[in-house]
Structure formats: C-alpha cells, structure tokens
C-alpha cells in the first residue's frame, strides 16, 4: 500500500504542475482537470464497504492495479503539445475506479487477522508508512522530472544549430512573422523547455505504469 501510494501521490503532484507550466492552465483549471479522479470513489466506496464481506478483496486490489497501469500508460502515450482539456481529464476519471478499489480493500487485507488489541497500533503504523511514502514519492517525482527535463532540453538544443536545415527553416518562418532573431531564439527555447517537460513527465508516467 505504501509503494502504490508513493506512485499515486507522485502523479497527483506532477499532473497539475505539468498542466500549469506547459499548457498554461491556471491553478483552478489544473484542479478541475485533476478533480475527476474523485468522482467514482464517492459513488463506489459506500457500495464496496456495504458488500465487503461478500467480495474477494484480492480481486479488487488486482483490478485496481490493472486500472492504475492502464491510466499511467494512457498518459504516457497521449500527453503531447496542444492536447485539450479532455485528454488530461479522462485518464483521471478512469483512474477513479482504481482509487475506489484500492485503498479500502488493501487496508482491509492489511489489518485482517490481527487481534483487536493490536488493531490500533497496526492502523497507526499503516497510516504513518503511507504518509511517509507519499512524501518520498513527491520528492522523487519532482526531482526526476527536473533532472530528466534538463537532459532532454540539452539533447533537443543540440539539434538547433546553423547546420540543421530544419532549424534554419524555422528561424526563417519566425522572422517572416515579424520576430527578430533574438525573439525567435527565445520562442524556440521555450518550445524546447516545454517538450523536455512533457517527455520527462511521460517517462515518469511510463515508469509508474
């Protein structure tokens, strides 16, 4: 549960930052794009709780792992420049099924079989390790995102040189739109940064899957 929470919380932190830095979302719109993940758990959690004694928790957790992998792969191969709001919101909505079928069933499995006098201590330890894993996941995700962006930025920048006809053609097009050479260089640098952020985020999503 701690490892899964590490991946889940890292993605929660990464997605709004990506939407704001690359796609120009405000904090409100980034929150709205992330919010659909909470819709399904609101509906399913009471149902799962009511029929928990009739359900095999292991199957629910396995289903949630599969859904997590599907959503992370979905993001890894669909996040690209110019994507619309739905491209970020739909994976969040589907991930709600994974959230609903993960936390409560896995907590039930973790605490099942313990004597009543040890239940409080086990629950506290489980909550502590889950919170700690979330903090570690956030640190790892943000650090990896920054470092990978720097690497991809350097690799992409190498292609922008006087010997690359595509780069020279782009400069000519930008200057034809009224930009000076300095403005064109600044615009290209921003596009390279955005590409680096998207590629590094997609790599993190792929690893998480």
Question: What is the meaning of each model-derived region?
Answer:
Residues 35, 115, 127-128, 209:
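Charged, amphipathic alpha-helical interaction segments
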Residues 1-121:
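Transmembrane core module of solute transporters
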Residues 126-208:
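Hydrophobic transmembrane architecture of multi-pass small-molecule transporters
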């Amino acid at each position: 549960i701690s490892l899964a929470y590490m991946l889940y919380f890292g993605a929660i932190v990464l997605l709004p930052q990506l939407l704001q830095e690359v796609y120009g979302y405000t904090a409100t719109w980034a929150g709205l794009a992330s919010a659909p993940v909470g819709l399904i758990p609101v509906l399913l959690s009471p149902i799962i709780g009511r029929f928990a004694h009739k359900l095999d928790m292991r199957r629910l957790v396995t289903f949630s792992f599969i859904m997590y992998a599907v959503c992370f792969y979905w993001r890894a191969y669909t996040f690209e420049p110019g994507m619309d709001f739905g491209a970020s919101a739909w994976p969040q909505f589907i991930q709600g099924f994974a959230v609903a079928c993960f936390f409560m069933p896995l907590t039930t499995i973790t605490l099942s079989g313990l004597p009543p006098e040890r239940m409080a201590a086990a629950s506290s330890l489980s909550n502590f390790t889950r919170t700690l894993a979330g903090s570690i996941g956030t640190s790892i995700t943000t650090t990896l995102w920054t470092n990978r962006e720097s690497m991809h930025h350097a690799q992409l920048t190498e292609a922008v040189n006087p010997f690359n006809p595509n780069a020279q053609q782009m400069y000519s097009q930008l200057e034809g739109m009224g930009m000076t050479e300095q403005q064109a260089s600044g615009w290209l640098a921003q596009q390279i940064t955005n590409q680096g952020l998207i590629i590094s985020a997609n790599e993190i999503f792929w690893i998480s899957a």
